[in-house]
Each structure stands twice: as structure tokens, then as C-alpha cells.
Amino acid sequence: MSGFSYAGRDFSPYVQAELVEPAAHVLEPRAFPVSGRPGAVLLGSELPPREVRLRLHLDAGSQMAAFELSRLRALLRAWLCVPGGGDLAVPGEGSLTWRGAVVTGVSDWDSLFEGGSCAVDFTCYDPVAYGDARSCTGTELEVLGTWPTLPVVRLTATAGSSVKVADEDGRYVLVERDLSAGDEVVMDFASESVTVGGEDASADVGVGSAFFSLAPGAHVLTFSGCSAHEVTWTERWL
């Protein structure tokens, strides 16, 4: 057990947390019934929001006066009430963070143990955790994690009419417009947007372009129309 943080608050001075997690993600299948045969045809599956349960332990609770314990519990209630959700970092998961987490279930305080304990259920509407940020200025990169990530590509353009980045499978993003040497082109694959010199240039994305994801493993990217480039991404973990 150790502390945890939620929505920018560090709970470790007040409680110890124990992660209670399922063995795997439960998927939501999409299926279509077919006349004349039993069952249905599986079309695919969706990854629903992740449920994370923490058991909180008030180790110092037995050393507090009744009013102090009441104040502490009120403080914890306030910290856990975040209607807009927040980032959640739990014990035993290293640098992983879940985004868009909101409290959707709680138990009563159990006074069986020395300082009292309770269970708190978080629903993480972005179910794939975020790990370490990575970057590469070469053409070969290694993506860690267990889920595809969407990169950001920054290019320093040469004078010309286009810049392009492509992967080993032939997928590419092409920006076609007049460019001056030194123009900064930023391709955000998550938002499927492009800026040139800080101004929106998404309308200049060429036909056939696809803002591709990078699956875990090795990749080789090619760049054209630029004198320098940097690829940044964040590891994603189930």
C-alpha cells in the first residue's frame, strides 16, 4: 500500500491506498444478427471506461480526537468530489496516470481496522493509462506500452511547396502549401490538426493523408520537405 493522487491532490499524508483491480479489461462487443443462423456475426468490440477501485486506510485515525477525524473525513470528501473529473495515479502502477477519472461509487467507513477504511470506485472515461513521454529526432523509434499512441510531429520546413511524414506501412500526412525555410510545421495526430508558424493549416492537408497511430514496437518514419524533425509521444498502457 502507498499513497495516491487525484485531480492534483496528494492523498499520501492522510491515507494509504490499496489498488483492487480486475485481471483484464471487459470489452463491449458489437454484433449483427443474421437470418437463418444461430447467434450473430461479431463486428468488433469497444473498450469501455475503466473501473478502478481503491481501498483507503486512515492509519492515523485512531490517534485523532473525534472532531479531528470528522474534519479529515470531510476534507477527503471534498477532495474526491471533482465533477469535471481529473487525473488519477494509483499505487503500484509507477508513472501511469488515468485521465478523465471521476468518483462513481463509495462505501461507508469501516471501523474494524485501527484507523478506519473505505472503498472508492473511480470511472476512468479514458480507459488506457498514460505513461512516460518520449521523443525521437531520428527516423527509427521504439514505442513502449501495450496500446497504440498518437504522436505529435514537429518539422522545420525547407523552402518549398510541401512537407510529408510517412510510416513503414505507407501511411502518411502531407501538407501542401508554400513554405519558407525555417517555418515550423506541427502535426498533431490526436486532434488531426496541423499548424504552420502557430496558425491553423489543417485545410492544407493533402488528399489521401491519414493521421496514423504508432503501435507498440519498432517503427521507421520518413520525412521530406524539412531540414529537421522531432516526434513526441506518450506511452499508453492497458
Language-model regions, residue ranges each:
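Polar/acidic, low-complexity leader/linker segments enriched in S/T/G and N/D
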Residues: M1-P33
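Intrinsically disordered, low-complexity coil segments
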Residues: D59-R71, D178-S180
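Intrinsically disordered, low-complexity segments enriched in serine, threonine, and glycine
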Residues: V128-L238
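Short amphipathic beta-strand/extended segments with alternating polar/hydrophobic composition
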Residues: F11-Q16, T97-T104, Y172-D178, S202-V207
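Short amphipathic alpha-helices in soluble, non-transmembrane regions
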Residues: E68-C81
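Oligomerization/assembly interface segments of phage tail-like spikes and tubes
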Residues: F32, R37-M64, E114-P127, H219
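Short beta-strand and beta-hairpin "edge-sheet" elements
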Residues: V82-V128
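Solvent-exposed loop and beta-edge segments used for protein-protein assembly and interaction
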Residues: E46-R50, L80-V82, L112-E114, G145-W147, ...
